Amino acid sequence: MSHSKSSQRWLKEHFSDPFVKKAQAEGMRSRAAYKLEEILKRDRILRPNMVVIDLGAAPGGWSQQIRKQMGDSGRVIALDIVKMAPLVGIEFLQGDFRDKAVLSQLEIMLKGQPVDLVLSDMAPNKSGIDVMDQPRMMYLAELAMDFADIHVKPGGSFLIKLFHGVGSDGYIRQLRHRYKKVAIRKPLASRKRSPEVYILGDGKLTQNEVSCS
């Protein structure tokens, strides 16, 4: 299939997508908000007054969904290397979360508050070549897991997008040593042909529990 035909097919599918239409009608910045909504309803990991960090947040659909679910309570801190237009009730930090200066700024923003939930909907710019895209995705996933290891409090949760493929099973095994419950989710808003899945780690183990597991 030619590039132009592929692009035309994507555009047609995109604009006829019910979740795209719903996002436009409800003022959500992306259809991804409804993937998160389904997971939150199913797994009930979000409660009032939580502190939530959204990695790779732009354009902001996940942050919007968290704020919608928590109302005026708690804090939502969105992090991204690219600029994100302001959202009511969302604190935004622009920068690379691997950067020590950015992490220092995050610590200042947190003011010692423990983090209840870390989200990551990050993905690399796709080339369409699996042998290139999958390692890039797993690299981002490892970075996000390291971030969650440091920032999520014991008993807290971590939700991340993965591409199912080389390295994903091993990654899930790593999470099983870190969280009491690990679940794999494929929301309705996730296109069937997409390799993406969402992995939830709930009930972060303490260091003593990790050592005994």
From Swiss-Prot:
GO molecular function (one)? rRNA (uridine-2'-O-)-methyltransferase activity
Enzyme Commission number(s): 2.1.1.166
Q: Name one Pfam family in it.
A: FtsJ
Intracellular or extracellular location(s)? Cytoplasm
| Positions annotated to bind S-adenosyl-L-methionine | G60, W62, D80, D96, D121
| InterPro entries for the chain | RNA_methyltr_RlmE, RNA_MeTrfase_FtsJ_dom, rRNA-MeTfrase_E, SAM-dependent_MTases_sf
The family database entries (Gene3D superfamilies) matched by this protein are listed as: Vaccinia Virus protein VP39
For this UniProt record, the keywords arranged alphabetically read as follows: Cytoplasm, Methyltransferase, rRNA processing, S-adenosyl-L-methionine, Transferase
Q: Which reaction does it catalyse?
A: uridine(2552) in 23S rRNA + S-adenosyl-L-methionine = 2'-O-methyluridine(2552) in 23S rRNA + S-adenosyl-L-homocysteine + H(+)
Catalytic center at which residues? Answer: K161
SUPFAM superfamilies noted in UniProt: S-adenosyl-L-methionine-dependent methyltransferases
Which segments cross the bilayer?
A: none
Choose one Gene Ontology CC annotation of this protein and give it.
cytoplasm
Indicate the family of this protein. Belongs to the class I-like SAM-binding methyltransferase superfamily. RNA methyltransferase RlmE family.
Task: State what this protein does.
Answer: Specifically methylates the uridine in position 2552 of 23S rRNA at the 2'-O position of the ribose in the fully assembled 50S ribosomal subunit.
Q: What is this protein called?
A: Ribosomal RNA large subunit methyltransferase E
